[in-house]
């Protein structure tokens, strides 16, 4: 989570210095959790992308299971259907899995040297009259692509000038960042005053006493009500069903004049 021009967003960034930003086992779950946060909070998802796709010797870890492989890209479609934008700044080379990252967001902003292309045996096979790829077909594909080196299919020239995938292209890397900020600025945001139910105030009890109540010694129990009284506006707390489930404390309180729900474990009960 981060703020872009004072608006919250979920940010996913490739670290191209580690395995060229490749996918490894468990990454799809991490990406899916990030999209879940964007959905729950109704805030944009922003990628800074320079991804070399799936690490080939870990394919079985990436594609096996339900929340893997293409799940993050399906989640992009879900967010867009809900009106939650997915923005991507594209840098460097993004083949295969990196290509899906590139094409599935709502708005694509690219550095002039960026490129994106999906790949895999199935895609290459689909380009061949035969339903599979053999040595003859592979050599034919290699020969055919030699003529594309001056204007490769995944280049900015193609995806900005021909397919129209890329919305904007910048000669400087900083220009991509500035464009992302520009589009985030265009998005609506909540005004907290709409949800404020009271004038903000400090707790009536001394907040600094929390350091004496909650100690590093985890074997020493403490009274959770003493903690609650030093966290919320005016030290006010409206407890819900106090006689049920004594190991838990639930209720309503205010933080900075905003109404919040409270769930706390009671120390020393179980």
Model-predicted regions and their roles:
Residues 156-164, 202-211, 263-264:
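Short acidic (Asp/Glu) and glycine-rich catalytic loops that position anionic groups and cofactors
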Residues 49-192:
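Conserved catalytic cores of soluble enzyme domains
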Residues 23-26, 64, 148, 165-179, ...:
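Catalytic cores of large soluble enzymes that bind and process phosphate-bearing ligands
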Residues 4-6, 40-42, 82-83, 102-105, ...:
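Short, well-ordered loop/turn elements at secondary-structure boundaries
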Residues 10, 25, 57, 96, ...:
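Short, electropositive, low-hydrophobicity segments enriched in small/polar residues
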Residues 1-87:
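Long, structured ligand/cofactor-binding scaffold of large enzymes
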Residues 1-13, 17-19, 30-33, 39-40, ...:
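Non-catalytic terminal/interface segments that mediate subunit docking, oligomerization
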């Amino acid at each position: 989570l981060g703020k872009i021009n004072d608006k919250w967003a979920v940010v996913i960034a490739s670290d191209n210095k580690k395995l060229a930003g490749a996918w490894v086992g468990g990454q799809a779950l991490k990406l899916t959790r990030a999209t879940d946060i964007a959905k729950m909070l109704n805030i944009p998802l922003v990628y800074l992308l320079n991804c070399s796709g799936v690490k080939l010797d870990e394919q079985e870890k990436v594609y096996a299971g339900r929340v893997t492989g293409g799940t993050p890209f399906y989640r992009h479609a879900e967010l867009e259907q809900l009106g939650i934008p997915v923005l991507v700044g594209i840098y460097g080379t993004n083949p295969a899995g990196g290509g899906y990252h590139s094409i599935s967001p709502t708005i694509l902003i690219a550095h002039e040297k960026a490129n994106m292309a999906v790949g895999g045996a199935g895609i290459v096979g689909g380009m061949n009259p035969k339903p599979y790829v053999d040595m003859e077909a592979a050599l034919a594909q290699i020969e055919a692509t030699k003529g594309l080196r001056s204007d490769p299919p995944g280049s900015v020239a193609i995806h900005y000038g021909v397919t129209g995938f890329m919305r904007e292209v910048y000669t400087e890397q900083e220009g991509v960042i500035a464009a992302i900020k520009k589009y985030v600025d265009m998005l609506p945001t909540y005004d907290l005053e709409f949800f404020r139910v009271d004038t903000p105030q400090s707790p009536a009890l001394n907040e600094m006493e929390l350091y004496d109540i909650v100690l590093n010694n985890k074997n020493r129990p403490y009274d959770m009500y003493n903690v609650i009284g030093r966290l919320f506006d005016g030290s006010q707390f409206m407890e819900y069903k106090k006689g049920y489930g004594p190991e838990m404390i639930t209720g309503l309180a205010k933080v900075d004049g905003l109404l919040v729900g409270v769930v706390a474990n009671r120390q020393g009960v179980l």
